[in-house]
Amino acid sequence: FYNKTNKTMSTNTGHPKGLYLLFFTEMWERFSYYGMRAIFILFMTKALLMKGADASNVYGSFTGLVYLTPLLGGYIADRFWGNRRSILIGGLLMALGQFLMFLSGSTVIDGMESASSVSMMWAGLTFLIIGNGFFKPNISTMVGQLYPKGDHRIDGAFTIFYMGINLGAFFAPLICGGIGDTGN
């Protein structure tokens, strides 16, 4: 991926411009993920009227699968698709998953769950899990591919990249949790 003739360096930091694209992409992906997680139990118990134990089981299963699927997504990227295609497909699947989660909440009428709400929630979770599997292991790899082997700037690049992850993870629960909990 590294190209010696690539002149797309930021004049301010000495890092490739692609690093900042990856920084913001990952920051917003983490914001989306942790923001959804911040209100997911509330959504299942308040809007879909699930029992707390059932909602906790769904939440735990979702979280576990989100951390398991990158093993398969990384393998598919390494063997067949490559990083870019895997990130693109994963991002699109996660966007579709978030959209379906939004729609599942939009079909709840006066606190009464409908079969379509629950079905859309499950479809949304499925797309989020699969999309994350393709997205997560490959975007970090692309940070390393921006630099030639042995480049001293790579440590700083990963620090910048992980700062994006942490910013998204920090602000998402505060913002989405504050907006999502209406006190009902």
Annotate each predicted stretch with a short phrase:
Residues 3-30, 115-117:
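Cytosolic juxtamembrane N-terminal segment immediately preceding the first transmembrane helix
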Residues 27, 97, 111-135:
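Hydrophobic core of transmembrane alpha-helices in multi-pass small-molecule transporters
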Residues 38-56:
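Short amphipathic helix-loop junctions that connect adjacent transmembrane helices
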Residues 44-45, 76-80, 175-183:
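Interfacial helix-cap and linker-helix signal at transmembrane-aqueous boundaries
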Residues 60-78, 170:
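Central cavity-lining transmembrane alpha-helices of secondary-active solute carriers
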Residues 65-66, 155-181:
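Glycine-rich segments within core transmembrane alpha-helices of 12-TM secondary carriers
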Residues 79-93:
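Cytoplasmic membrane-interface "Motif A"-like loop-to-helix N-cap segments
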Residues 89-116:
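C-terminal ends and interior cores of transmembrane alpha-helices
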